[in-house]
């Protein structure tokens, strides 16, 4: 079983970014995109999802779309964050922490 997790942190005030809608899309080799799962960050700004990955799933690309426009109520430039990645090991834990602000973001791959 694979695990995908993320932690969204608000760089403006140092809090956890709770209530942010997150969509994980799967993109197959033909470029066809489908929603793999949807969720929302919890009070701690986190998402966590366990799932089975088939061999075909491991050959796909994925994108995590974080809908940040509603989270920041003032004027902002970044309305959503899109991170593209792969999950090639069906038994691995994938962790994508993101520091967000109204006008920028920073991400790293954590294992």
Indicate residue ranges for each PLM-predicted region.
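Beta-strand-dominated extracellular/periplasmic modules and repeats
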Residues: 2-88, 93-97
